[in-house]
């Protein structure tokens, strides 16, 4: 499915798919299977944080990913954007992040040496970048 992260390096059966509209329709949400989560999502997190994150993780709605649009000139362009790259991300690779930045350019780009979950693996670095980003944006 276009727009869904390619995790084929980890095998063919990485996702638990939910079929909210019945199994004769496309899946409505997905969740990375338990046995892959630490390796893919939380490889830079402590075991304790990885366990906590696993308890909090919920299925992601596929339509939100598949239906995302980046229309130029729409009212949403008036909202300042920043992008924080997660350099060690195994879900959305740095190359994919660069493509996202190019497709819908933000005001500023920051980087954090983190996996897909910087709020667990690098919370203080993430906080510092959020403060820096907030200070750099014009007041509304």
Where are these regions (language model features)?
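Helix-loop "lid/cap" segments that line or gate small-molecule binding pockets
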Residues: 35-44
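Short, charged N-terminal helix-start/capping segments
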Residues: 11-21, 47-58
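Eukaryotic N-terminal low-complexity, Ser/Thr- and Lys/Arg-rich leader segments
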Residues: 22-23, 131, 135-140
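Conserved serine/cysteine hydrolase catalytic core
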Residues: 48-51, 55-120, 124, 128, ...
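Compositionally biased amphipathic helical and low-complexity segments enriched in hydrophobic
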Residues: 8, 127-131
């Amino acid at each position: 499915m276009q727009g869904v992260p390619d995790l084929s390096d980890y095998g063919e059966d990485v996702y638990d798919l939910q079929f909210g509209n019945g199994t004769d329709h496309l899946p409505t949400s997905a969740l990375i299977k338990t046995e892959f989560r630490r390796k893919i999502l939380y490889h830079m997190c402590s075991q304790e944080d990885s366990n906590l994150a696993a308890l909090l993780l919920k299925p992601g709605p596929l339509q939100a990913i598949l239906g995302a649009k980046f229309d130029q000139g729409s009212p949403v362009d008036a909202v300042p954007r920043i992008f924080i790259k997660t350099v060690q991300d195994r879900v959305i690779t740095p190359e994919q992040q660069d493509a996202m930045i190019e497709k819908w350019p933000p005001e500023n780009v920051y980087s954090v040496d983190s996996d897909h979950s910087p709020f667990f693996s690098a919370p203080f670095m993430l906080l510092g970048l959020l403060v820096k980003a907030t200070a750099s944006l014009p007041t509304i």
